[in-house]
C-alpha cells in the first residue's frame, strides 16, 4: 500500500498519463508519431524532481522540467492542452483503484478467517447480551456469522466506492475541452482503464472522493465493532476470549500479571482516525467555483493515511481472530451465572400458551427472575414454585424450557444465509483443550 502512494510511484503514474495523452494526440494527427516513440524513453528521477520543486514551488512543473532536461525538443509535446489537475486527479483515481484492490484482498482474507472460526464455534454456547446485560443464549459461531455477513456488505461497499472513484479527466483548465480534444481524453482514459467524468471543472468533483473515504470509515467502524466485542469479552470478569499474546510480551511496566487486549484497542483508536479523515474529505467537497486548492494539502495526507491504516487494520483483525483463544467452559459458566434468567421468555410464552394473559404471565416471570437475580438464587426453582406456574406446567414441561439447544435450533438457516455449511459441528476437542482456561 505504501508503494502506491510513494513519490516515485506517483511520478511514474504522471509519466504514464502524459505519454498516453501524446498517443491520443498522435492518433488524431496533432503530434508526429516518431516524437511519441522518442518520448517513451523518458525516465523519472524522484530526487531530482523534489529538488526542482523546492525551487519552483509546483510539483507538476518540477516534474515536467525534470523530463525536459533529458528529452530535448520533444518535451514540448508533453502536457499539450492539459492543466496540472488533469494529471493529478487522473493519477489519484488510479491510486485509489489500486488501493481498493488491496483492501478487497484484505477483506477476503479476513472473511476466510471469520468463516472458518464461525464453523468451528457454531455450537459454542454463550450468553447473548443486550445493553451489556445477559439476554438469551446464543453461540459464538452465531456472533461470528454476523461479522461475516457485515464483512460481505463492506466488501460490496468497497467495490462500489472503487467504481465510483474510477473516473479521470483530461479536459483542460476549467473542464471545457478548449485545449484538449475530447477524443484524446476518451482514448487516453480508456487505455488507463478509467471512465470519463462527464462534466468537470479544473478538477473532478470531490463527491467521488468523499464517498470513497466515507466507505473506508464505515469499514473501519465494522472492525471497531468487532474489536469492541473482543475487548468486552476479554475483561477479567468475563474472560471468554483472549487475544493472541506472545510468550515474551509484556502488558504493563508496573503490573506483571497484565494481559491486555491492546490489538483490539489499537483497531478502535485507528478507526477513529479514519473517521476523522472521512470528515476532511466531506469538507473538501465545497471548492470555490471551478476550483480552489484548499483540498490539495489535505488530500496529500488523508488518502495515503486512510488507505494504509485500513489495510493495516484489516490485516491485524484477521490475525486477532486467527489466534483468538476461546474459553468454551467459561462461556457456558457465564451463561448460567445469572441463575438461568436467560430462559425467562420461554417460560413467559409457555404460560401464555397455557391460557394466561401476557400481562399476568409477564408479572409472574419477572417477579421470579428479579428475585433470582437479587438473591443469587436459581430462577427455575423460584419460578417453578409460583402457583400460577405449578397450575399450568408439569415438572417435565418446565425443564424443557431450560434447554439451551432450543435457542440454536434454527442456526442452520442463519448459516445458510451467509453461505456457511449448515452442518452441526461439535467443538474440536484438540482446539478446545488447547484453548481451555480463561485469563
What are these regions (language model features)?
Residues 1-171, 177, 181-187, 196, ...:
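A helix-coil-helix interface module used to build multimeric assemblies
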Residues 185-278:
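Acidic, glycine-rich loop-and-beta core segments that form the ion-binding/anion-interacting portion
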Residues 24, 66, 70, 113, ...:
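Generic, well-ordered alpha-helical scaffold segments in large soluble proteins
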Residues 84, 176, 189, 196-203, ...:
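A structural signal for small-residue-enriched, beta-sheet-centric alpha/beta enzyme cores
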Residues 1-13, 17, 37, 41, ...:
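Glycine-rich cofactor/substrate-binding loops
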Residues 97-108, 115, 145-148, 152, ...:
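Short amphipathic alpha-helical segments with heptad-repeat character
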Residues 31, 238-239, 357, 434:
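Conserved hydrophobic residue
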Residues 142, 210-218, 346-354:
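Short, well-ordered beta-strand elements within core beta-sheets of diverse protein domains
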